[in-house]
Regions:
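N-terminal signal-anchor transmembrane alpha helix
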Residues: 20-58, 204-210
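Membrane-interfacial loop-to-transmembrane alpha-helix junctions, especially the N-terminal start
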Residues: 22-24, 123-133, 192-200, 259-271, ...
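Alpha-helical transmembrane segments of multi-pass integral membrane proteins
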Residues: 30, 135-137, 194-215, 273
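Interfacial helix-loop-helix junctions of multi-pass membrane proteins
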Residues: 40-52, 138-161, 215-230, 279-303
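Individual transmembrane alpha-helix segments
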Residues: 73-107, 235
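Hydrophobic cores of alpha-helical transmembrane segments in multi-pass inner/ER membrane proteins
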Residues: 105-110, 164-179, 238-249, 301-317
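A juxtamembrane structural motif centered on a specific transmembrane helix
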Residues: 173-196, 309-332
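Membrane-interfacial catalytic/cofactor-binding modules of polytopic membrane enzymes
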Residues: 205-243, 247-255
Length: 332
C-alpha cells in the first residue's frame, strides 16, 4: 500500500529494519571514533608518524623502537623531498591506531552495504545512501594518502575533515530511512523557520572551518601569534552568531503547533553541544590550549553538525504514516 513516496513494509521485515538501523548507527559511531583518533593524531602532530601508506615504515605492524629500523630510515622514507621525522613510538602508534580504526570502520561499512544490498535493494533511497558511503570512504582514504604524500598540506587536511562529515551524515541518512515518518508540507512560518535552521547549519559549518584554519595557524605560527590574529577574533565572535541562530531555531521547534518529538530531541542535543563547544573554546583561549581540549573541540564541532542536520531532517519528516508507528521505507 503506497502513501506518497512511502510504502508499508511487511511485518516480517521489521526485525531486519531494526537491525539495519542499529548497524547504521554503529557505523556512525565508528566514524566518530575515527574522528577522535584523527584529532589525537593531529594534536600530537603525528600525521607523519608513519611516513608511508598503507604500510608503516614498510611494515604491517610498526616498530616500537628506533633500533628496529634500518640506519638510513629517514632517507629511505623521505616524503615530498623532506627527511622522515625522527622515530617517535608515541606518534607512530597513534597514527597506526588511527589507520586501524579506519579499517574497522571500513569493515562496518562493508557489512552495512552488504546487508542493504542483500535485504533492501528494492528501496531506492536507502540503497543510494548506503552505496554512497563506500564511495565517500574510498575518497577519504585517497585523501589520507595525499595528506601523507604532501606532508600534511593544510587544504587537504581540511578536505579530509569535510569528507568525514559527509560520511557521518550518510550513515545517519541510512538510519533515518527506517523511521515511519513522511514529510509534512511546510508553509508560512514553518517554512521560514526551516530555512533559517539550514542557514544556521551552514553558519555552523563555516565556524568549524574557521576553527580548523585557526588550528593550522597555531601549528605553524605558535599559540600566542595565532590567538592575536584577526582570524581568532572572527572565530570567537562568530560563535555567538551561531549560538543565536540555533537557539532561535531550537525555540521555534518547541513552539511549533505540530508535536515534533524527534526534532525536539535532536535540537536540544545540538544546543547543548554548541554551548559546550563555545565553553571549551573559551577554556582553550584563556586557560589551556592542550591536546585534550583541541580534540574535544573538534569532536563537538562535527557532532553538532550531525545532530543539527538530524533536527532539521526530523523537522520536516515528522508525520507518522500509521498511528501504530510501523516501520516504512522510501521507495522513490
Amino acid at each position: 500500500v503506497k502513501e506518497g513516496f512511502m510504502s508499508q513494509v511487511p511485518e516480517t521485515e521489521w526485525p531486519r529494519m531494526r537491525r539495519l538501523r542499529h548497524l547504521a548507527f554503529l557505523v556512525w559511531g565508528l566514524f566518530f571514533l575515527v574522528v577522535v583518533a584523527g584529532g589525537t593524531v593531529r594534536v600530537l602532530e603525528a600525521g607523519m608518524g608513519c611516513p608511508d601508506w598503507p604500510t608503516c615504515y614498510g611494515l604491517l605492524i610498526p616498530p616500537t623502537s628506533e633500533a628496529q629500523l634500518p640506519p638510513d630510515y629517514r632517507v629511505r622514507f623521505a616524503v615530498a623531498g623532506r627527511l622522515a621525522e625522527p622515530f617517535d613510538p608515541l606518534k607512530t602508534w597513534a597514527e597506526y591506531i588511527n589507520r586501524l580504526l579506519t579499517v574497522v570502520a571500513g569493515l562496518g561499512v562493508l557489512a552495512l552495504v552488504g546487508y542493504v544490498w542483500l535485504r533492501f535493494r528494492r528501496y531506492k533511497r536507502v540503497l543510494l545512501y548506503a552505496t554512497a558511503i563506500p564511495a565517500a570512504l574510498v575518497a577519504e582514504a585517497l585523501l589520507g594518502w595525499q595528506v601523507v604524500a604532501t606532508y600534511l598540506a593544510q587544504h587537504l587536511v581540511t578536505l579530509h575533515m569535510i569528507f568525514t562529515l559527509v560520511l557521518t551524515i550518510l550513515a545517519f541518512m541510512v538510519a533515518a530511512q527506517t523511521y515511519a515518518l513522511r514529510g509534512r508540507e511546510l508553509r508560512g512560518n514553518s517554512l521560514w523557520y526551516w530555512r533559517l535552521g539550514w542557514l544556521g547549519w551552514v553558519l555552523l559549518g563555516v565556524q568549524v572551518l574557521l576553527g580548523a584554519t585557526l588550528r593550522s595557524w597555531v601549528r605553524d605560527l605558535g599559540v600566542e601569534t595565532a590567538l592575536e590574529s584577526v582570524l581568532f577574533y572572527v572565530h570567537r565572535s562568530f560563535s555567538w552568531v551561531v549560538v543565536g541562530f540555533w537557539a532561535y531555531f531550537h525555540w521555534r521547534v518547541y513552539m511549533d503547533p505540530v508535536r515534533l518529538r524527534f526534532a525536539r530531541r535532536w535540537a536540544m542535543v545540538t544546543t547543548i553541544l554548541i554551548v559546550t563547544q563555545v565553553f571549551v573554546g573559551a577554556i582553550m583561549s584563556y586557560f589551556s590550549f592542550s591536546g585534550f581540549w583541541k580534540v574535544l573541540h573538534l569532536l563537538l564541532g562535527l557532532l553538532s553538525m550531525n545532530t543539527a542536520y538530524a533536527a532539521l531532517y526530523f523537522y520536516k519528516y515528522s508525520e507518522y504514516v500509521h498511528a501504530s508507528g510501523s516501520y516504512v521505507f522510501r521507495v522513490a
